[in-house]
């Protein structure tokens, strides 16, 4: 608490207290202008954190590669050096999470949703550094994780930090700025401001308190974060790939079929994630040493995979252009799909600080392109472009697992600049959502939050017995 007070005083030291009070609130309720101004601050900071997090992860990955090529690779066998470097990087991520902020494990998005429901606390002074540096280690080791979950959680933590610095007491304002930070984080992760806004409005709809001021705050935060991202990284799309034209109307039924298949897989995939998480808990039994040893070994394994099968490692964003350029046969695509399903479950299920958006997009691309290539062979009468099915698959798997079809559609369009494919994306994503709902599947982040709350309750019940 003392450190937090020092932060507040240092920020506001040269601003008259009366001016702060007049700006932030009118009575006990913040003014609309002050909320939007704070949302702009949140978006700017979330954009900086998210953008430099991406830069930091790339720096770690490039440095790891350079070390293998030069100093360490010349002293030790290459395979051993790869295992040691990636294992050490993974250890950093697991240790920081376990020691300082257990809530920073995994994606972090369920934690923000829980905070919006006032059932999870946001220790921003711990979460931001732990997620940033822990994520650098985990993602830099080559594990199959995405950066969007960390940036959303760090963005939400930035929103809570700003409300604490400005001593905002109004619950609705604190809620709005928390959601604004999450939107800013996603906008900075994927250069996708529209998807970031819709993610809060659609995926977080059970927790989000709809009002004109809260919507405006989310929009402003996403815009500011995206401006920061583009100012630093440029205005190119995150994924470089061909620009496709809208497919023939006669082939639209294939997109519905593809969406249905993804609907089935999405339900199975979500259940497999829970099974993987429970399996890792059963393996290390919440013992710190066993947890760190398990994570370090897993990181070392992915260091080895980086040398021999790099397609099975990393978030997968870099793999997507190779897929859509037709560099792999159908059989290879299927094997890569199965392999990346396994590696995604291993990495995300282990509790490493990383997200699952990017790995899911890669999985959707793999299966979607394989489906499109197969359809092109079996239906020569139709003009089929497999790359279109790859893009549709990205949105469909996101929609089936996260249960946010509009967000998935916007995310894919913004990331690939393929605006002409909105119709097949809608058909595929809605088909996936409908099938997933019919099968009774739960949205992934609601499922993860429920599991976290359940495990916390069980630990609290066991605490008196252990103390006794």
Curated annotation (Swiss-Prot):
Residues involved in chloride binding: 107, 356-357, 445
The keyword RNA-binding belongs to this UniProt entry's keyword annotation: no
UniProt site positions, description: Mediates proton transfer from the protein to the inner aqueous phase: 203
A GO molecular-function annotation: voltage-gated chloride channel activity
Motif Selectivity filter part_3: chain residues: 355-359
Segments traversing the membrane: 33-69, 77-100, 124-141, 148-166, 215-232, 253-281, 288-309, 330-349, 355-376, 422-438
InterPro entries membership: Cl-channel_ClcA (IPR023861), Cl-channel_core (IPR014743), ClC (IPR001807)
Residues on Cytoplasmic side: 1-32, 117-123, 167-176, 202-214, 282-287, 439-468
The keyword Transport belongs to this UniProt entry's keyword annotation: yes
Chain ranges inside the bilayer that never cross it: 109-116, 177-189, 193-201, 387-401, 402-404, 405-416, 417-421
UniProtKB keywords: Antiport, Cell inner membrane, Cell membrane, Chloride, Ion transport, Membrane, Transmembrane, Transmembrane helix, Transport
Compartment list: Cell inner membrane
Record's GO cellular component terms: plasma membrane
Annotated site, Mediates proton transfer from the outer aqueous phase to the interior of the protein, chain positions: 148
Motif Selectivity filter part_2, residue numbers: 146-150
The reaction(s) this protein catalyses: 2 chloride(in) + H(+)(out) = 2 chloride(out) + H(+)(in)
Membrane topology: Multi-pass membrane protein
Motif Selectivity filter part_1, chain ranges: 106-110
Cross-referenced Gene3D superfamilies: Clc chloride channel
Pfam family, one: Voltage_CLC
Protein's job: Proton-coupled chloride transporter. Functions as antiport system and exchanges two chloride ions for 1 proton. Probably acts as an electrical shunt for an outwardly-directed proton pump that is linked to amino acid decarboxylation, as part of the extreme acid resistance (XAR) response.
NCBIfam families (UniProt xref): PRK05277.1
Family affiliation: Belongs to the chloride channel (TC 2.A.49) family. ClcA subfamily.
Assembly information from the UniProt record: Homodimer.
Protein name: H(+)/Cl(-) exchange transporter ClcA
Organism for this UniProt entry: Vibrio campbellii (strain ATCC BAA-1116)
Gene name as annotated: clcA
């Amino acid at each position: 608490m003392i450190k937090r007070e020092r932060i507040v005083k240092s920020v506001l030291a040269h601003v008259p207290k009366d001016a702060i009070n007049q700006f932030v609130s009118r009575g006990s309720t913040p003014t609309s202008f002050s909320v939007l101004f704070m949302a702009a601050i949140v978006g700017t900071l979330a954009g900086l954190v998210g953008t430099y997090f991406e830069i930091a992860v790339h720096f770690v990955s490039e440095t790891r590669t350079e070390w293998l090529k030069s100093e360490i690779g010349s002293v030790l066998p290459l395979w051993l050096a790869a295992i040691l470097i990636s294992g050490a990087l993974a250890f950093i991520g697991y240790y920081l999470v376990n020691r300082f902020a257990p809530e920073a494990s995994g994606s972090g998005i369920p934690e923000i949703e829980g905070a919006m429901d006032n059932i999870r606390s946001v220790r921003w002074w711990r979460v931001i550094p732990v997620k940033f540096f822990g994520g650098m280690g985990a993602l830099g080791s080559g594990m199959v994780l995405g950066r969007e979950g960390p940036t959303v959680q760090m963005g939400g933590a930035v929103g809570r930090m700003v409300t604490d610095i400005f001593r905002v007491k109004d619950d609705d304002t604190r809620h709005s700025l928390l959601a604004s930070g999450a939107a800013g984080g996603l906008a900075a992760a994927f250069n996708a401001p529209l998807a970031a806004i819709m993610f809060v409005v659609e995926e977080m709809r059970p927790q989000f308190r709809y009002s004109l001021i809260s919507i405006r705050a989310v929009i402003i935060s996403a815009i500011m974060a995206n401006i920061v991202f583009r100012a630093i990284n440029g205005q190119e799309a995150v994924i470089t790939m061909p620009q496709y034209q809208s497919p023939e109307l006669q082939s639209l039924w294939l997109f519905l079929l593809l969406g249905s298949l993804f609907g089935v897989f999405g339900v199975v995939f979500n259940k497999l994630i829970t099974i993987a998480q429970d399996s890792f808990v059963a393996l290390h039994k919440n013992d710190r040493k066993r947890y760190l040893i398990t994570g370090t070994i897993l990181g070392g394994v992915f260091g080895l995979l980086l040398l021999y099968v790099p397609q099975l490692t990393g978030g997968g964003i870099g793999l997507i252009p190779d897929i859509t350029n037709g560099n792999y046969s159908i059989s290879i695509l299927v094997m890569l799909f199965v392999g990346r399903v396994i590696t995604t479950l291993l990495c995300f299920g282990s509790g490493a600080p990383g997200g699952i958006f990017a790995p899911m997009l890669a999985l959707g691309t793999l299966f979607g392109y394989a489906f499109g290539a197969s359809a092109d062979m079996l239906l020569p009468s139709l003009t089929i472009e497999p790359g279109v099915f790859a893009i549709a698959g990205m949105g469909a798997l996101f929609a089936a697992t996260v249960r946010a079809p509009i967000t998935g559609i916007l995310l894919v369009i913004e990331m690939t600049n393929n605006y002409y494919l909105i119709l097949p994306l809608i058909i595929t994503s809605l088909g996936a959502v409908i099938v997933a709902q019919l099968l009774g599947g739960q949205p992934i982040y609601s499922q993860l939050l429920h599991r976290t709350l359940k495990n916390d309750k069980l630990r609290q019940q066991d605490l008196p017995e252990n103390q006794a």
